[in-house]
Design a protein with these regions (language model features):
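Positively charged, low-complexity terminal tracts
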Residues: 1-125
């Protein structure tokens, strides 16, 4: 069954942490919700950015487009695995994403960030 969503209304975590509920209003004005198990939430989160970028490219017919969030802050912390660190990237409105980074990649990332940016063509919106 396909449901066309007008707006997202609320998002909640079950008291036991086992599911996440996404509440919405459909185009007819009816309230509804989708409950996703904790096991499937990770798969959903990993899928959405790729779908968003594919939709953006399809809508505007431009394969160079990227959906990017403005970075407001970042933090590094040690993982329980001593060969890894965790980097948290955060936007001003509180969206966060975390990545674990092996030691070798940490150095490569640091070096890459210190290099001058290559010249690229900037196109106005």
């Amino acid at each position: 069954m396909e449901i066309k969503v007008r707006s997202l209304t609320n998002c909640e975590v079950a008291p036991d942490g086992g599911t996440i509920s996404l509440g919405f209003e459909d185009v007819a004005g009816n309230a509804a919700a989708v409950s996703v198990s904790l096991n499937q939430v990770g798969a959903l989160i990993m899928t959405l950015p790729g779908l968003l970028e594919a939709a953006l490219k399809a809508r505007y017919g431009d394969q160079s487009l990227r959906y990017a969030y403005p970075l407001s802050s970042w933090a590094l912390e040690q993982s329980t695995d001593t060969t890894q660190r965790i980097i948290t990237l955060e936007t001003e409105d509180g969206f966060k994403v975390r990545f674990s980074i092996p030691k070798a990649e940490q150095s490569l990332l640091g070096e890459a960030l210190t290099q001058p940016m290559p010249e690229v063509m900037v196109r106005p919106n």
